[in-house]
């Protein structure tokens, strides 16, 4: 073996052995417990970033540790390859999205392989491949048969110049990102999946998952089960009687209604705008706004009075109807009751437009004022009804019951459970996605593609230009025959939401070569024992994958109803930021590698200059690594300079997996230095370490016993930390082990070999290359087999036994020293040793002991 640690050589040798042995190809094995750990599959953006490195290393560490503990472990990988970024890149570079995507996959796969990850590449999938998305189409058709998939109109952002639908993020200040045209809202037919049919189950099943509590809460809030009252305000228009329906969770405040607001798309708004240009102009303005709930939450709340009133269902008083830009047709009934006295948004709206504000609940000790909103105005826990006629004095629950009963008696409404969750719209007016398997026939209407004709293959040679969906212009794709009547027909040009692709890929990993969607192997591996990904996926991806899994179960495809037993949301990787700001306020961000930072005497950064010109830059603080802040670190540069093991060691040591990790160049150098020490000890002592000599543990000398005691004590903690996924303290344990072994004076070669072998196995899951090569070079592989499957070291409990124990020695309650006594020594022996100790003589001022307190195994306190 080399005297010097050369990461490139070590890693090439180890990876060569793993490839030759097909070391990570995994098969089902009923004789072993299984452990299926999956990292959320990446989007092939071009290069890995440090967040990827951290995520995959966590997964890899878990895999290797459990494999050593006898588990049949599986770590697969794939590519979430469809989506809008590929279309944007294609437009920018003039190449088909397919070429851009496949080139990126090739590069990123090479990066992953250079990290030494234990991936079973025989299971690799790319969601843009027909043999994968065929099953998206197949299940969609099954859902269509069962009524889970259906078609209805939905609201989209429409660019009238480019004649195309825009995603929410492509609408900038109400204009199309490419054309600059004012964006309109349009109603178009789209396909939806009835995720709401599973709302109760999705909510209730969260309780049985080993997921972070904050993720569960985020999903609970998104599903949003609400108990309230659905009722209508009666009105008459053009001789027709009808109800303006609303849903509220605060029926106790119904006597405080002073207006109603409807969405711009509400049928009543459309009717009331006829012949009123100012109303129609406002409706058109609303339709140019964003269609996402998040957009509505942050936009300025605007409204226009219609001049029309409905009647209050309990008092008969007129209630003015407004059109509000903050009311979404896709949520609830597309109309809301306005109670400005007790809803903060309504309060602001009423103050803005001079609408009446009525107090109808009161809280003891609180004074109501119209001057400014106070938090207690919306309280339902302690408040009672006032100014509400027969409901005065009732608390929230009783008031809701009474109001609901009266509304029901009048035929206006009743109690209702509603959900914030909405059905999943899966139609996307984009090219680079799974084609929706529907054919439009002028005679037969919408006809599902027959199962035997799947997949509907997406052409991969089209280059989008931003002016509409390329599929609509591709005659070869578009034109077909109707499966029912044989007449000329057109294919559906919408593609599926890319969340469909990521909703079941983990099941396909288990049976990648199956000629069905999944097979019996899926029930062996699934559900995932551990899923790893960022908190940003807490809602949509994780919720959709849970729904998709339950649909697969109900269709008899699988036996499980949840995709993942346990979830780890790894923390973000942070780095310093630096920038300069020009006169217009525009910031230019500089990469930390191009900046020199000066520090004060306490190590705090106090200034920074750009290396190219020596001029100052502003310290922007520590933020998440991102392209926008230009503060990323290229993992490939790190691997090329220090080796993959150093990158892995640093990312595991710098912080616990679930916490944020602050990048540190000094930390990387420290990780590299530690690995050089591990290697150097092995190389320097290779003759002693390679000698396979047995020993009698009982006959060992003090130095050997002390070293074994230290190593097995630390091993016990490291094993516990591996089990609780605290890999940073595992690395700390390994550092303690090396210090103990390297500093052991008088230890015999046999004990050095034993303890160094423990160190290599403890470190192996984190830094597999260097430990694998040392294990082989020092002859451990000949004795125990390759490190890949070497058994996890067991703690020798006998080695932890001590002939002597150390007690804290106190004089008058103050620590004055340490006292070594024989393990099992009698109380008299301990007291005698204590008063004979030189610390007692020094701190007792010559006074005799009045009292001696012995706390067994812990301390002796001499009172003088």
From Swiss-Prot:
It is found in: Cytoplasm. GO terms for biological process: leucyl-tRNA aminoacylation. It comes from the Bacteria. A motif ('HIGH' region) lies at residues 42-52. One of its GO terms (molecular function) is aminoacyl-tRNA deacylase activity. Its EC number is 6.1.1.4. ATP binds at residue 627. Signal peptide: none annotated. It catalyses: tRNA(Leu) + L-leucine + ATP = L-leucyl-tRNA(Leu) + AMP + diphosphate. One of its GO terms (cellular component) is cytosol. Disulfide bonds: none annotated. Keywords: Aminoacyl-tRNA synthetase, ATP-binding, Cytoplasm, Ligase, Nucleotide-binding, Protein biosynthesis. A motif ('KMSKS' region) lies at residues 624-628. HAMAP family: Leu_tRNA_synth_B (MF_00049_B). Belongs to the class-I aminoacyl-tRNA synthetase family. This is Leucine--tRNA ligase. It comes from Burkholderia ambifaria (strain MC40-6).
């Amino acid at each position: 073996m080399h005297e010097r640690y050369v990461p490139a050589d070590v890693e090439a040798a180890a990876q060569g052995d793993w490839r030759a042995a097909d070391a990570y190809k995994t098969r089902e094995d009923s004789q072993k417990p299984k452990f299926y750990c999956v990292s959320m599959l990446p989007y092939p953006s071009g290069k890995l970033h440090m967040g990827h490195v951290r995520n995959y290393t966590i997964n890899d560490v878990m895999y290797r540790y459990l494999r050593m503990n006898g588990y049949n472990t599986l770590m697969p990988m794939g590519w979430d390859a469809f989506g809008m970024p590929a279309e944007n890149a294609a437009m920018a570079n003039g190449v088909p999205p397919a070429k851009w995507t496949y080139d990126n996959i090739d590069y990123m796969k090479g990066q992953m392989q250079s990290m030494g990850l234990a991936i079973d590449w025989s299971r690799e999938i790319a969601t843009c491949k027909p043999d994968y998305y065929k099953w998206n189409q197949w299940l969609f058709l099954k859902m269509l048969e069962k009524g889970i998939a259906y078609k209805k109109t939905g609201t989209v952002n429409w660019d009238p110049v480019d004649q195309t639908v825009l995603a929410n993020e492509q609408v900038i200040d109400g204009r199309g990102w490419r054309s600059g045209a004012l964006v309109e809202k349009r109603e178009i037919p789209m396909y939806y999946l009835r995720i709401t049919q599973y709302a109760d189950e999705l909510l209730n099943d969260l309780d049985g998952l080993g997921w972070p509590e904050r993720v569960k809460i985020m999903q609970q809030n998104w599903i949003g089960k609400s108990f309230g009252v659905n009722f209508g305000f009666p009105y008459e228009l053009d001789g027709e009687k009808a109800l303006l329906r609303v849903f509220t969770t605060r029926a106790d405040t119904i006597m405080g209604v002073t207006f109603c607001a409807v969405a711009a798309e509400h049928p009543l708004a459309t009717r009331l705008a006829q012949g009123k240009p100012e109303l129609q102009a406002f409706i058109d303005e609303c339709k140019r706004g964003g269609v996402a709930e998040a957009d509505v939450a942050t936009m300025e709340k605007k409204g226009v009075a219609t001049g029309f009133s409905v009647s209050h269902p309990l008092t008969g008083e007129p209630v003015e109807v407004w059109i509000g830009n903050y009311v979404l047709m896709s949520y609830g009934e597309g109309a809301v009751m306005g109670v400005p006295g007790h809803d903060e948004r309504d309060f602001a709206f009423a103050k803005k437009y001079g609408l009446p504000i009525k107090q109808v609940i009161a809280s003891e000790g609180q004074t109501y004022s119209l001057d400014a909103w106070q938090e207690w105005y919306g309280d339902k826990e302690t408040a009672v009804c006032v100014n509400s006629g027969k409901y005065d004095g009732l608390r929230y629950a009783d008031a809701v019951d009474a109001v609901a009963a009266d509304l029901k008696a009048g035929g206006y409404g009743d109690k209702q459970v509603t959900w914030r969750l909405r059905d999943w719209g899966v139609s996307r007016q984009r090219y680079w996605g799974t084609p929706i398997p529907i054919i439009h026939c002028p005679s037969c209407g919408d006809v599902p593609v027959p199962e035997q004709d799947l997949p509907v293959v997406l052409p991969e040679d089209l280059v989008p230009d931003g002016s509409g969906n390329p599929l609509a212009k591709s005659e070869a794709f578009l034109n077909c025959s109707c499966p029912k009547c044989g007449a000329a027909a057109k294919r559906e040009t919408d593609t599926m939401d890319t969340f469909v692709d990521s909703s079941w890929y983990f099941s396909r990993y288990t049976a990648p070569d199956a000629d069905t969607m999944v097979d019996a192997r899926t029930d062996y591996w699934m559900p995932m024992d551990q899923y790893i990904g960022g908190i940003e996926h807490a809602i949509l991806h994780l919720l959709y994958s849970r729904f998709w899994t339950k649909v697969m179960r109900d269709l008899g495809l699988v036996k499980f109803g949840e995709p993942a037993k346990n979830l780890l949301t790894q923390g973000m990787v942070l780095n310093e930021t630096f920038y300069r700001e020009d006169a217009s306020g525009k910031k230019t961000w500089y990469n930390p590698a191009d900046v020199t930072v000066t520090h004060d005497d306490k190590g705090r950064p106090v200034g920074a200059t750009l290396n190219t010109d020596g001029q100052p830059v502003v310290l922007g603080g520590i933020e998440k690594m991102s392209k926008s802040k230009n503060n990323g670190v290229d993992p490939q540069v790190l691997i090329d300079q220090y080796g993959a093991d150093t990158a892995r060691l640093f990312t595991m040591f710098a912080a616990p997996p679930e916490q944020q990790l602050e990048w540190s160049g000094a930390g990387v150098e420290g990780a590299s230095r530690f690995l050089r020490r591990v290697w150097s000890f092995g190389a320097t002592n290779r003759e002693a370490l390679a000698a396979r000599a047995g020993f009698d543990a009982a006959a060992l000398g003090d130095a050997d016993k002390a070293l074994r005691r230290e190593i097995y004590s630390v091993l016990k903690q490291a094993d516990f930390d591996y089990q609780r996924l605290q890999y940073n303290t595992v690395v700390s344990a390994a550092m303690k082990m090396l210090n103990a072994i390297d500093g052991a004076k008088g230890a015999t070669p046999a004990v050095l070999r034993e303890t160094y072998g423990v160190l290599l196995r403890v470190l192996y899951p984190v830094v597999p290359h260097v430990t694998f090569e040392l294990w082989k070079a020092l002859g451990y592989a000949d004795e125990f087999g390759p490190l890949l499957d070497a058994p996890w070291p067991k703690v020798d409990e006998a080695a932890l036994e001590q002939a002597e124990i150390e007690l804290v020695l106190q004089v008058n309650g103050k620590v004055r020293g340490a006292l070594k006594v024989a393990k099992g020594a009698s109380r008299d022996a301990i007291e005698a040793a204590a008063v004979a100790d030189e610390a007692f003589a020094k701190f007792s001022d010559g006074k005799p002991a009045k009292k001696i307190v012995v706390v067994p195994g812990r301390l002796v306190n001499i009172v003088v």
